[in-house]
């Protein structure tokens, strides 16, 4: 039964509709552009899925990548009218991508789908994708045991990504990467009933 539900949830239209109903996409549409305050240049969206956040970055030369081929095909259809928007099915750990090419890399909402080993590998690869002086924008939900109410814990437990980490874990992770962190910010959940976990934003300069 769980496998069937997961397959249904992974259908791009179903997933996007669910995100709209519970307000997740609306929150991201205000959070992501406020974090990535630039308006132009080359931008890599790692783990773009079916392009749920792509519309926020149409002023960029936008590249979206994901391992999920059906989601990428859905994204291509959705944004086929935009010549500056491109999507690719890529396993970045196995294949890599454009090195020293991007002004911005968006690493958003995907880290909790990665194991610790995968997180380290992906982070270093994404840094390699940046031009010197480029910016990596890391955004991911965090677990806060001292704050999270049962509704938040339920959402975290129901998420397909099983590696929601604490802020302390990420502080240790980024300190071990020997990178220049220029911004560290918590985006609190804006809703009173649907208690999403708060999101951590970290800006890194290559």
Language model segments and positions:
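A short glycine-rich, Lys/Arg-flanked "PGG" loop and its adjoining helix->strand segment in the class I
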Residues: 120-132
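Local beta-strand N-terminus motif with an aromatic residue
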Residues: 40, 102-103
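Class I (Rossmann-like) S-adenosyl-L-methionine-dependent methyltransferase catalytic domain
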Residues: 1-43, 48-96, 114-120, 137-206
């Amino acid at each position: 039964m769980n496998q069937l539900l997961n397959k249904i949830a992974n259908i791009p239209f179903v997933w996007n509709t669910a995100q709209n109903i519970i307000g997740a996409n609306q929150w991201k549409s205000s959070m992501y552009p406020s974090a990535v305050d630039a308006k132009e240049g080359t931008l890599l969206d790692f783990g773009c899925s079916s392009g749920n956040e792509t519309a926020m970055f149409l002023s960029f030369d936008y590249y979206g990548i994901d391992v999920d081929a059906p989601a990428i095909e859905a994204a291509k259809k959705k944004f086929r009218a935009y010549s500056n928007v491109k999507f690719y099915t890529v396993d970045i750990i196995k294949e890599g991508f454009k090195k020293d090419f991007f002004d911005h890399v968006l690493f958003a909402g995907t880290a909790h789908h990665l194991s610790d080993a995968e997180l380290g590998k992906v982070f270093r690869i994404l840094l390699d994708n940046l031009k010197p002086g480029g910016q990596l924008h890391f955004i991911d939900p965090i677990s806060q045991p001292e704050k999270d109410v049962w509704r938040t814990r339920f959402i975290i437990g129901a998420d397909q990504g099983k590696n929601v980490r604490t802020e302390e874990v990420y502080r240790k992770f980024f300190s071990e990467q020997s990178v220049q962190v220029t911004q560290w910010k918590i985006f609190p959940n804006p809703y009173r009933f649907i208690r999403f976990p708060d999101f951590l934003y970290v800006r890194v300069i290559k």
